[in-house]
From Swiss-Prot:
It is found in: Cytoplasm; Mitochondrion outer membrane. The modification Phosphoserine is found at S139. This is Queuine tRNA-ribosyltransferase catalytic subunit 1. The gene is Qtrt1. The active site is at D105, D279. The keyword Cytoplasm applies. Belongs to the queuine tRNA-ribosyltransferase family. It comes from Rattus norvegicus (Rat). Pfam families: TGT.
Length: 403
């Protein structure tokens, strides 16, 4: 079945993105998202929560770190506790006691992560609940209905998600279906004045398919666009080229959300390529393995070398963990049954991600972004010859050289 050629019935979408500054050399941009629960400065990293909470950090702590937007998962929230209960709590904001913005995903990612539990048809995605085994259909209409009930500030279309390493007819089928499902999501969206529906660009690693998807989806006047179908095992060279292709064709006056990207180098490179929003479980997941994010990479605090190290994780980090605890203390906690270390590391790792993109934003505003990139790479890798070849190539494609 071919992609639907006529845009959906969405009324003129609100312009939620205000561009504040652009890098004179690369595609990097600094902006503001004007959302129902406040303004969000971009570029921005968005921490990920599954069931109305972040693992290892409270909403109050996220607030204190300066986080102004985070994610919730429609698939999990739709199953447990369910949208009806959350609606009674005045939406997800009230349920979480979160005063700032929320973005909910569509539930489509579980088509990849829970593939053994799902079946995809034109109707939607049929899941078997991992909680009770009950079968449920997540259609584009139901995904939007759940997200309308949750009351998030940004909602995502249901897309047909395939792993980035899949090739062949399934990728084309998924791309065309994602366009058709976008129109169904637009038609089902009942709260256009309060919630901003983003389209998700698909097409895998095939430039022609991704170009077709970009041309089709940008005909729809939605408030923003996500770049989907990446960060799933493809090579970094394939990854950056698809990101660059996407940002080259997306409208400049709308936000660009690169899904599932969280490694520091990836964030900096993709800001240079023109992306505004990022999310990933990486900072919280890596904390649970005793790993702390620092400008030079990661500290594996379980290692014996930190047993008598009384310095903070990062002396320049203002987070509560670095202001209060030493590496030696965290090392000791990690070797006990105490879960406090995971909490302290999560606070620090999220702070690191937020600070990194805040620093990138400041450099864009001050027209020194290329220098920011060079300093970041020098600190992370030492000599520029040790930087990943893909990153050097990607940065060069937008006019930033490291020498």
């Amino acid at each position: 079945m071919a992609a639907v050629g006529s845009p959906g019935s969405l009324e003129s979408a609100p312009r939620i993105m205000r561009l504040v500054a652009e890098c004179s050399r690369s595609r990097a941009r600094a902006g503001e998202l004007r959302l129902p629960h406040g303004t969000v400065a971009t570029p921005v990293f968005m921490p990920v929560g599954t069931q109305a909470t972040m693992k290892g950090i409270t909403a109050e702590q996220l607030d204190s770190l300066g986080c102004r937007i985070c994610l919730g998962n429609t698939y999990h929230l739709g199953l447990r506790p369910g949208p009806e209960l959350i609606q009674k709590a005045h939406g997800l904001h009230g349920f979480m006691n979160w005063p700032h913005n929320l973005l909910t995903d569509s539930g489509g990612f579980q088509m990849v992560s829970l593939i053994s539990l799902s079946e995809v048809t034109e109707e939607g995605v049929r899941f078997r609940s991992p909680y009770d085994g009950e079968e449920t259909l997540l259609s584009p209409e139901r995904s939007v209905e759940i997200q309308n009930a949750l009351g998030s500030d940004i909602i995502m279309q249901l897309d047909d998600v395939v792993s980035s390493t899949v090739t062949g007819p399934r990728v084309e089928e998924a791309m065309h279906r994602s366009v058709r499902w976008l129109d169904r999501c637009i038609a089902a969206h009942k709260r256009q004045d309060k919630q901003n529906l983003f389209a998700i660009i698909q097409g895998g690693l095939n430039a022609d398919l991704r170009t077709t998807c970009l041309k089709e989806m940008t005909k729809r006047d939605v408030p923003g666009f996500a770049i989907g179908g990446l960060s799933g095992g493809e090579s970094k060279e394939q990854f950056w080229k698809m990101v660059a292709l996407s940002t080259s064709m997306l409208p400049k006056d709308k936000p660009r959300y690169l899904m599932g990207v969280g490694y520091a180098t990836d964030l900096v490179v993709c800001v240079a390529l023109g992306c505004d929003m990022f999310d990933c479980v990486y900072p919280t997941r890596t904390a649970r393995f005793g790993s702390a994010l620092v400008p030079t990479g990661n500290l594996q605090l379980k290692k014996q070398q930190y047993a008598k190290d009384f310095s903070p994780i990062n002396p320049e980090c203002p987070c509560a963990t670095c202001q209060t605890h030493s590496r030696a203390f965290l090392h000791t906690l990690l070797h006990s049954d105490n879960t406090a270390a995971l909490h302290h590391l999560t606070v620090h790792n999220i702070a690191y991600q937020l600070q990194l993109l805040s620093a990138a934003r400041s450099s864009i505003l001050e027209q020194r972004f290329p220098d920011f990139v060079r300093n970041f790479m020098r600190t992370m890798y030492g000599d520029h010859s040790l930087c990943p070849a893909w990153a050097i190539e990607a940065l060069a494609s937008v006019g930033i050289t490291l020498t």
